[in-house]
Regions:
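PRPP-associated nucleotide enzymes
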Residues: 1-133
């Protein structure tokens, strides 16, 4: 929402929902909710919170390219390239991060921490403490 408020261009916002099971089984990725607009011949910007292995994003980009947009550009807040398994083009990256589990600013762990106004690192001890609550 912060990003959208700071873009001073006419745009149409669409949301997609992608499901993935496991990190290395690309065949277990599927689109649960697709864009509701015809994107043929139109520029598309994909906004991602975090790009990790790149497998889901690669699937998404192939899915969108099949709809023949004029261009597809990816903007990612966080890039965890150390875990990359699929080469994906990132047009814009906010921050490169190490291989740590991050939470806050929309990122969650078990439905928790998504509402934090900042991004933090979840240490290995914290999930155990949450499970005991």
């Amino acid at each position: 929402a912060d990003l959208m408020r700071n873009i001073d261009l006419p745009m149409q916002i669409e949301f997609m929902e992608i499901s993935h099971y496991g990190e290395e089984r690309e065949e277990a990725i599927e689109v649960l909710r697709d864009v509701g607009t015809d994107i043929q011949g139109r520029p598309v910007i994909v906004i991602e919170d975090i790009v990790d292995t790149g497998l889901t994003l690669r699937y998404l980009l192939e899915h969108l390219q099949a709809q023949k947009p004029s261009s597809v550009t990816v903007c990612a807040l966080l890039d965890k390239s150390v875990r990359r398994m699929a080469k994906v083009p990132l047009g814009y990256v906010g921050f490169e991060i190490p291989d740590e589990f991050v939470i806050g600013y929309g990122l969650d762990y078990g439905g928790l921490y998504r509402n934090l106004p900042h991004i933090g690192v979840l240490t290995p001890q914290e999930p155990k403490a949450v499970a005991q609550r």
